[in-house]
Amino acid sequence: MRKGKIAAQASHASLGAILNYGKHLPEVEGKYESVNISLRHQPLSEWLNGRFTKVCLYVNSEQELLDIYNKAMYNKVNVKLIKDAGLTEFNGVPTLTCLALGPDYPEVIDPITGHLKLL
């Protein structure tokens, strides 16, 4: 992917993970609500009010990306997987491009992504 495409896909994943985080909370009932509701949940609150840390890592294939996604789902870690429609890259083929985990504590995320290299 081109650098701009990588940035866009990472932005989609990051925002999607935040929106998913609130979506899975019992009191929100599947709707995207204001961040104020979600701030009652410790990992998200600490992340939003702290350093807002994000790390970009590299995988070698769509399958490796899907494996990370499945591992996150298995461990009940908030995750958002992005599939690009393929309109500007990938020759019109919908392609898995990116995912975001969390926000959560390093001890939750690192066992899933600790083996990956920085982008």
List the predicted regions and their residue ranges.
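Positively charged, small/polar-rich N-terminal and surface patches that mediate targeting and assembly
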Residues: M1-L119
